[in-house]
Amino acid sequence: MLDAQTIATVKATIPLLVETGPKLTAHFYDRMFTHNPELKEIFNMSNQRNGDQREALFNAIAAYASNIENLPALLPAVEKIAQKHTSFQIKPEQYNIVGEHLLATLDEMFSPGQEVLDAWGKAYGVLANVFINREAEIYNENASKAGGWEGTRDFRIVAKTPRSALITSFELEPVDGGAVAEYRPGQYLGVWLKPEGFPHQEIRQYSLTRKPDGKGYRIAVKREEGGQVSNWLHNHANVGDVVKLVAPAGDFFMAVADDTPVTLISAGVGQTPMLAMLDTLAKAGHTAQVNWFHAAENGDVHAFADEVKELGQSLPRFTAHTWYRQPSEADRAKGQFDSEGLMDLSKLEGAFSDPTMQFYLCGPVGFMQFAAKQLVDLGVKQENIHYECFGPHKVL
């Protein structure tokens, strides 16, 4: 526990943090990667270049300082970050490195004096221990469950299937022939790659796209413009190739009773965790209402349409609606979509009027903000809306 003086000293730095903004974390990362370049093998350097990770870390630091007297308020954020850390295989000793550079950054940017540095050192130590302990629990859970493992495990690509002009699915089975750990629908795999020509090891998280079967995993990858890893997977990864995986993780997952109605809302590749949820509901014979609402640019980039239709047919109460923002003439001729333009949930209000319905969202942040606002305006309770950001977390 932190003493009152330490808490007061940390809280007194909040105005300075707010004034500085993400420039603080930019300095921190630049310093850390200069002095500890080995950490480039762990961090997603693409998120460093576009500034997303720097913004996410700044928001986390500011939230900690603001809630330092009420740590339980931070537990949802801690869980999200700890789950992600396990896919990077973060170790306790790496927290010492981060702490060293955080304090040095505060000193170099603000020269706040030893009292402030000591207070932040104590505060960081408390938070680091929270993460270390929770991550140890997750590592132990992953290693001890049936089919689980520690660290990375070699998996072979056994199928590679284009699903649209931009999305390709990969089916993976363990090289050792053993069973694989189950997961909750909505969670992701940590994929570790360092192909020839890559300057650093790259680690990515890809959502699992079907119900666990104990034998292998399926992910789907969108080709991102300029994306080093996604383009390598699309262009160079082949059936028979071996990749390293970390056990499934993630705090975004569906856990509902059979009589709980569910709405799955997605855009683009955001449908991937929803597929695992839909597959799970279909194979469980879910009896309550299930809605599938999806937005795509057009038919060329609309993946898994046939699979969704087939899964929906096995559910007794299923409604699907697809929006194409800019459908082609071929799309119109085929009748592959229901509405043109942006997703408008007000026209489907009757499909989710049950106050117990749970809503799961995934897609670009702007889309999720747009969809979540519509739901709230239609009377949906905020606590019934669950969402996942691909990349560093953002608040809707």
UniProtKB/Swiss-Prot annotation:
GO terms for biological process: cellular response to nitrosative stress; nitric oxide catabolic process; response to toxic substance. This is Flavohemoprotein. Residues 1-136 form the Globin domain. Heme b binds at residue 85. It comes from Escherichia coli O157:H7. Residues 150-255 form the FAD-binding FR-type domain. Keywords: Detoxification, FAD, Flavoprotein, Heme, Iron, Metal-binding, NAD, NADP, Oxidoreductase, Oxygen transport, Transport. Residues 147-396 are annotated as: Reductase. Disulfide bonds: none annotated.
